[in-house]
Amino acid sequence: MPTINQLVRKPRVSEVIKSKSPALENCPQRRGVCTRVYTTTPKKPNSALRKVAKVRLTNGFEVISYIGGEGHNLQEHSVVLIRGGRVKDLPGVRYHIVRGSLDLQGVKDRRQARSKYGAKRPKAA
């Protein structure tokens, strides 16, 4: 336990909390332009072709973000909205693209968890 005199000379320093999504700069979402849309393979126990996009944000950052859901209409120069949230089996992917916003359409024929994929409510049969 330090003395009061020691604390006067050298005060306690609180730990700096590192952001998990630094490119957002404390904003909930950020807009950006796709520079490359491609597929990549996940880490060891899993196997798939995951859809990702390299996005240049309005604040100058260039990040890799994940395109969730089945099928998408993204290509180079598409304007997208990104949010935080990493993909555990894709190293370096720390952001998600918001479905149904700006140039990215919602998932077609989606019935459950629609709000997460930008899908409108289906017409009652």
Swiss-Prot record:
Q: Which keywords does this Swiss-Prot/TrEMBL entry list?
A: Methylation, Ribonucleoprotein, Ribosomal protein, RNA-binding, rRNA-binding, tRNA-binding
Q: Select a single GO molecular function from the record's annotations and give it.
A: structural constituent of ribosome
Carrying 3-methylthioaspartic acid, the residues are 89
Asked if RNA-binding is a keyword of the record, the answer is: yes
List, in alphabetical order, the GO biological process terms annotated in this UniProt record. translation
The UniProt entry's GO CC annotations, sorted and at most eight, read: small ribosomal subunit
Q: What does this protein do?
A: With S4 and S5 plays an important role in translational accuracy.
This protein's assembly is summarised as:
Part of the 30S ribosomal subunit. Contacts proteins S8 and S17. May interact with IF1 in the 30S initiation complex.
Q: Which family does it belong to?
A: Belongs to the universal ribosomal protein uS12 family.
**HAMAP family annotated for this entry?**
Ribosomal_uS12_B
> What name goes with this protein?
Small ribosomal subunit protein uS12
Q: Supply the source organism for this entry.
A: Cupriavidus metallidurans (strain ATCC 43123 / DSM 2839 / NBRC 102507 / CH34) (Ralstonia metallidurans)
> Coding gene?
rpsL
